[in-house]
Amino acid sequence: RISFDGKHLQSLTPDKGNHEIAFSPSKKYFLDTYSLVNVPPVTKLRRSSDGQEIAVLEKADLSIYKQVGVSPPEVFVAKGRDGLTDIWGIVSKPSDYDPQKKYPVLENIYAGPHDSFVPKSFVPYSEMQSLAELGFIVVMIDGMGTANRSKDFHDVCWKNIADAGFEDRILWIKALSKKYPYVDIERVGLYGTSAGGQNTLSALLFHPEFYKAGVAACGCHDNRVD
């Protein structure tokens, strides 16, 4: 909350997470549901005037995940092409993974400039985890050129959609393999739909030394028809 003069900034949702709120009819109270990609949802009742927590109403139960050995995605951060900028992404691995083995990597790519695409909230069912169960390390990355960061970060894609943040993505995956030897840097593929399909084809055409295979679905391969 903030005053019309730009002063007195006050957070009414202090818990770390991505928040969704719903006000009561009187607007005196609101429900605050928050989560992270690796933290399940919590719902609290708060007072609108100051954000005071009144009650914890619900916490998601992850016991069934633990029973089958599935873990939420891991958040991983590495430096981008400039050596300074943090590049964020997530990693899913098989529930029965063996750290002594090597696993091929699949990148779920979508580098459209109109948003950021790595999920910020908890996802109870994950396509990435389903693919990981087939024996892959599956990753999703927001490289330079995606939105919701600084203007300089976003402007990388200006009149340069083909960039797609590949320099950052490749560095990120290489950093992941340095931390986790079970990540096989010699077997990296990717897949995507729409802009992600275009990105997949671009990866194979312009970065074949790194990306060895790809599946492009409904790719917008000629931006002149957009």
Q: Whereabouts are the PLM-identified features?
A:
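Serine-hydrolase catalytic core recognition
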Residues: 11-13, 20-226
